[in-house]
Amino acid sequence: MNYKIIAIDGPASSGKSSVSRELSKILGYIYFNTGLVYRAIGFLKSKNIDFFDAVEKNRLVFELLIGQTKVIFDHDDITKELTKEYVGALASEVAKEPSLREKIIVFQRSLVKDNAVVEGRDVGTHIFKDATIKFFIDADPKERALRRYLEEGGSYEDILNKILKRDETDKNRKDYPFRKAEDAIQIDTTCMTKEEVINLCMEYIKKVL
């Protein structure tokens, strides 16, 4: 691999997405949110469209840019649509299929052809095991729930319960259980600002670039 990969993993609402986008801008690296692949599969499945067929026919295109990942379907930007809760539920079902998951990992790797900040579950353990540097961004579940509540509103208790349930489900998956890569640098963001997390990540990154 002739390019640098900054792999950032971690549970939901740990702050990994905002940190990853900012690091991408600082470094001038493309940004790849790998979870959007699962969401795109779920989105197309709801329309009875095969994901890999859509990719092959160029109906579905992933644009990896500095600070953002765009998903284009039939010339329309569907990136925002993919962030909706119903799509997330569909994506979770897709992630439970081990035979499909392996094919997805191969596809995700094929999209990265330049220096990149790659963010998402299993990035350090399965997708890019040989990444230049790996981070595992974590935070206390209550803090993660509070962040999502402040961002999206709704019921704090419901959000916390969903996060705890998601954590439990991911850790106990029979195939590809969610875990920290052994060589990943763990950062607990519970009592840290986004700027503090970014600065700490950059300190580590500068040592390996």
UniProtKB/Swiss-Prot annotation:
GO molecular function: ATP binding; CMP kinase activity; dCMP kinase activity
Subcellular locations according to the entry: Cytoplasm
Main location: cytoplasm
Reaction catalysed by this enzyme: CMP + ATP = CDP + ADP; dCMP + ATP = dCDP + ADP
SUPFAM superfamilies, alphabetized: P-loop containing nucleoside triphosphate hydrolases
Enzyme Commission number(s) from the entry: 2.7.4.25
Binding site for ATP: G10, P11, A12, S13, S14, G15, K16, S17, S18
Keywords carried by this UniProt record: ATP-binding, Cytoplasm, Kinase, Nucleotide-binding, Transferase
BP term (GO), one: pyrimidine nucleotide metabolic process
One GO cellular component term noted in the UniProt record for this chain: cytosol
Family as reported in the entry's similarity comment: Belongs to the cytidylate kinase family. Type 1 subfamily.
Name of the protein in question: Cytidylate kinase
Species this chain originates from: Hydrogenobaculum sp. (strain Y04AAS1)
